[in-house]
Every structure is written in C-alpha cells, then in structure tokens.
Amino acid sequence: MKASELRDKDVAGLNQELSELLKAQFGLRMQKATQQLQNTSQLKKVRRDIARVRTVLGEKGSQK
C-alpha cells in the first residue's frame, strides 16, 4: 500500500489497518518458524507496510 493512499485515511482506519498488518505479520512469522512459508518476501512487504502506517499515524499525531 502506498503512503499517499494511507494519508487519505482517518486515524481509526489507520489503526485498523495496523492491527490487520500485525496479525498478518504474526501469521507469517509462525509459518516461517514451522517452515511452511514459501514466499519469504511477504515478510518484508508486511514489515514495510507496518512502518508506512506507523509513519503516517505519527504525521497525523504531530499535525494536531
């Protein structure tokens, strides 16, 4: 997801997106630990999406 798309969302939507991404990251980490994960690049994508969401949340928090 692009940062410009995230900036259009409100704080509640961003928090919801963050919780979904964290759950996805947990699931991927468990799959990796049990050697069921085929595409390990998904971990990198989810990790960076989480960072993008947290960055936009920080920007919105500092605007107030």
UniProtKB/Swiss-Prot annotation:
One GO molecular function term of this record is: structural constituent of ribosome
Per UniProt, the keywords (alphabetical) are: Ribonucleoprotein, Ribosomal protein
GO terms for cellular component:
cytosolic large ribosomal subunit
What is one GO biological process annotated to this record? Answer: translation
One family from Pfam that matches here is Ribosomal_L29
What the entry lists under InterPro entries is as follows: Ribosomal_protein_uL29, Ribosomal_uL29, Ribosomal_uL29_CS, Ribosomal_uL29_sf
In terms of PANTHER family, this protein maps to: 60S RIBOSOMAL PROTEIN L35/50S RIBOSOMAL PROTEIN L29 (PTHR10916), LARGE RIBOSOMAL SUBUNIT PROTEIN UL29C (PTHR10916:SF0)
Family membership noted in the UniProt record: Belongs to the universal ribosomal protein uL29 family.
This protein's name: Large ribosomal subunit protein uL29
Organism of derivation: Ralstonia nicotianae (strain ATCC BAA-1114 / GMI1000)
